[in-house]
């Protein structure tokens, strides 16, 4: 379930980059490596999502809030985009619009199901779809130990890993070495930096 974007977002000169992909594809790892690579640059921002998930639950670095806290933030216009998925609520802070208005790049961990909301909020939207082979995904998910083998197989059988819709999508296959995928991610972001400068 997704919801309306923040009404003030939209007049940005920069590029909103939304990283999507299935669990186990390596989105968080690649975003962390890219953030480290671009850490000295003032024109590339990696935003943390606000999530109604306990901070110690694992996964990405995020701002953890209660359902009540999330609702208050949504009501006050604190999100550029927010959505629900897998029983949790996710939000992208509205302040990303400040960086975008300066012609910067903002990178966020998103969701394929919420891309139409990102597109409505950000006129210059690029999507990086991180994928990996089913065998690699299964191995990574099993290594996490959060799901049974049967649950993992059911997850992988749910459907294609492609992005559906009219979006500017770059595919990034992370089936090989993390170093190779990191270089691909950096090259994609370098290309987008060239577009805004």
Curated annotation (Swiss-Prot):
ATP binds at residues 21-28. Keywords: ATP-binding, Nucleotide-binding, Transferase. It is an enzyme of class 2 (transferase). One of its GO terms (cellular component) is cytosol. Catalyzes the phosphorylation of ribose 1,5-bisphosphate to 5-phospho-D-ribosyl alpha-1-diphosphate (PRPP). Its EC number is 2.7.4.23. The lineage of its organism: Bacteria, Pseudomonadati, Pseudomonadota, Alphaproteobacteria, Hyphomicrobiales. The keyword Transferase applies. SMART domains: GuKc. It comes from Rhizobium etli (strain CIAT 652). Pathway: Metabolic intermediate biosynthesis; 5-phospho-alpha-D-ribose 1-diphosphate biosynthesis; 5-phospho-alpha-D-ribose 1-diphosphate from D-ribose 5-phosphate (route II): step 3/3. GO terms for molecular function: ATP binding; ribose 1,5-bisphosphate phosphokinase activity. Belongs to the ribose 1,5-bisphosphokinase family. It catalyses: alpha-D-ribose 1,5-bisphosphate + ATP = 5-phospho-alpha-D-ribose 1-diphosphate + ADP. GO terms for biological process: 5-phosphoribose 1-diphosphate biosynthetic process; organic phosphonate metabolic process. This is Ribose 1,5-bisphosphate phosphokinase PhnN.
